[in-house]
Amino acid sequence: MEPTRVEVAYCEGWDAAAHAAFRPLKEQTARERHSTGRRYAALLSIDAEPRALIQVDTGAGYVGVFSFDLAGRRSLKFSYRDLGDHLMLRELKAWRHVDDDEPEFGADLRITFRFWPDEPVRATLDDARRGQFTSYVKLPGPLHRIPLLEFGRWPVDGWLLGAFEPLEFVTAADPEREAEGPFWAPWSAPEGARPTALEALFVPGARIRNGQGDVFEVREPRAVGKLRLPTGRIVAADPATVELQGEQAVAPYTVTLTPGEYAMETARMRTAGRGTDMVAAARVRVSEEPVATWELALRPGQDERLLGASEFFGFVVDSGTAAFMDASAVDALAAYQDADDAEAAEATIPGDGVSELLTFPSGKGDGSYPVWIGRDAVGSVTCLVADMRLLGRGVEVDAPGSSARNAMATARQVPGIAQLEVHDVAGIEAFSSQGILEFFNDTADAQAEFWARRMGR
């Protein structure tokens, strides 16, 4: 059988309005970006019809694959993350259109599968009429792991492209010239949550404005006390529900401190014109050195590379109260909350010997909150900050006086240390869409039918 000819054109992305590649690139430009960690895209076409769009950002460890439907819309998306020795499918999303007139990404039914290593797949159906339905299903085998991406060897096959195999990839002619000048990028790799104005939260008199037009006035930080860390292993958790949260939820962070006592304080602010203070953050001070970098605090088994857009690994609060504590306090506190072990725990909580914890109000109440690690210019830990995420997006800061502005000079963010368990990837096979898409479609159809029966057609 004659191979199916697949033309590959390089570009910045896809222009849905023009139904064409956006800002075409020369092949050599794309190669250079691939090797230097800069983003680019590859448009795959058969007989001048787009069949797939590959988005690559090797610097961010991201590969996205869009498949086009017969109406020329991007209707299926694979999102992969580079875990060092293989690519892992993190998300698979489909837009199920009823007719050809529905706009791209405007389908009434959206289906999203989220993948984690060694955990069930979270399947979410978003129906514009019936609402949202989420369930968990077991993935039959490691269908979500594929080899690392090499330039020119794209994670597509005939099943995904709607073509007969074998496939023959042919590079399109280079554009005569590449567009120059600034432009609004049509896509970016998913990026986890970032710390927002953490330094400014502890500068009295600073004014912070967010993208919604809210203006916050920063108050004087309030000292909470000395946090005693006999083991140097620190935990952030809801002190009222430690016994219920499970080992992973209350595991100490992978960063360790020298055993000792550390000052803890809360950042307070109020909305301009109002008289009620809010706790915006809690900080454990390790040194007085300025923060040069921020990184997300991680527990064993957590890997920042798996986070989606604006996601974070946080600690959960169900009682409106949060706490920093030493790891040695967790078992004693859990025993205190367990009626069977209450008597045994009484000698330890509150106690004055081996453990201690300090509590603070958790922002607006229950939720999940990240902890950020601040490091100085030489990499030493200067503080840990529990962020109550009250500021929102589009933050601008105005601080009084040069000393205050220097104190809140914005530190850059760096990736946290990956804590994902090592997996045996020797058996990983080349990309094949059939197995994962059959699983996806069968599961989605079954759950959509179940949901329709339950909710009423």
PLM regions: where:
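A structural detector for short beta-strand units
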Residues: 36-43, 62-68, 111
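A short glycine-rich beta-turn/N-cap micro-motif
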Residues: 48-52, 71-76, 107-108, 118-121
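C-terminal structured interaction module
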Residues: 122, 129-134, 345-396
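Extended, low-hydrophobicity segments enriched in charged/polar residues
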Residues: 181-334
